[in-house]
Amino acid sequence: MNSTLFSQVENHSVHSNFSEKNAQLLAFENDDCHLPLAMIFTLALAYGAVIILGVSGNLALIIIILKQKEMRNVTNILIVNLSFSDLLVAIMCLPFTFVYTLMDHWVFGEAMCKLNPFVQCVSITVSIFSLVLIAVERHQLIINPRGWRPNNRHAYVGIAVIWVLAVASSLPFLIYQVMTDEPFQNVTLDAYKDKYVCFDQFPSDSHRLSYTTLLLVLQYFGPLCFIFICYFKIYIRLKRRNNMMDKMRDNKYRSSETKRINIMLLSIVVAFAVCWLPLTIFNTVFDWNHQIIATCNHNLLFLLCHLTAMISTCVNPIFYGFLNKNFQRDLQFFFNFCDFRSRDDDYETIAMSTMHTDVSKTSLKQASPVAFKKINNNDDNEKI
């Protein structure tokens, strides 16, 4: 899912635009193959909006969490890691990919040729596995509240492991990414004189296909299946818990809270899958048979798929932060340039659970009326 994301731009341009057949190259000189200015302008606005929202949204989340010491729990530590990786994607992935795809030649130098896809692959791997760690933390918080629960130290260790894995899985881009003018050497058109392309040059097509297939599993299908399983189990547990609580407390409040949580859980999984699905399909098709994709429609189709995937950098802060009332409140202070004030008694302590984390099936049966009343009172303040 990397050639998928990064080298795909390079490879698409090289293999599609500069094949051994001059007809393909000449096709790009045909006016019918150039994107209309109106389309380029629209895409530029869309990419600009995603970059601005992705950078500002994730930066705001990072600052708000780091500013508040009482917010440095496992969930928020993982959210900061997620936001940081999304921030890198918004900075390193969107502008370079957009410019290179439109220009069909590389203008950012040899060092950036190697660094750009490497950083992009690292960032996306970190982002996706941050979602996995958050799913694990939610799972333990709700499914097994009396069992093993990750603490801050576990979160930091998990983040370190993610970054090591991301760097290791991205090393082929540092090794095989090259900047060359070879595709233009036999071209007599002045427009392509002194032009370079940046793409991966694996030892063979089988090596490239093996690597891109591995990334496809590592960066999409594997994490998506795992996240879906975790949130499905959470959904089932919350539904059962809701049925138990309906017998002992106000049904209207409990039903609305459960509905809200279920929608959030569904939205998290759907947003992740939907944002990345078009680019995943596009890259899979291109990797195995790039001739299926029409030369003239290639760049536009890729940019649309890529833009859809990059929207995930804006969606994540909304789901993991701005739907939380604490973040909404602190965001007002953030944009008003006011000091952040500590509000320990005011802060939510549970992001997805409708019950206190110590309340399980067993504890519900054993709780005394007085204790249960206290739990209810506390629970009213622990909303998403």
Swiss-Prot record:
GO terms for cellular component: neuron projection; plasma membrane. InterPro entries: GPCR_Rhodpsn, GPCR_Rhodpsn_7TM, NPY1_rcpt, NPY_rcpt. Coiled coil: none annotated. The chain crosses the membrane at residues 45-65, 77-97, 117-137, 155-175, 212-232, 261-281, 300-320. PROSITE patterns: G_PROTEIN_RECEP_F1_1, G_PROTEIN_RECEP_F1_2. Residues 66-76, 138-154, 233-260, 321-384 are cytoplasmic. The keyword Glycoprotein applies. Belongs to the G-protein coupled receptor 1 family. This is Neuropeptide Y receptor type 1. The lineage of its organism: Eukaryota, Metazoa, Chordata, Craniata, Vertebrata.
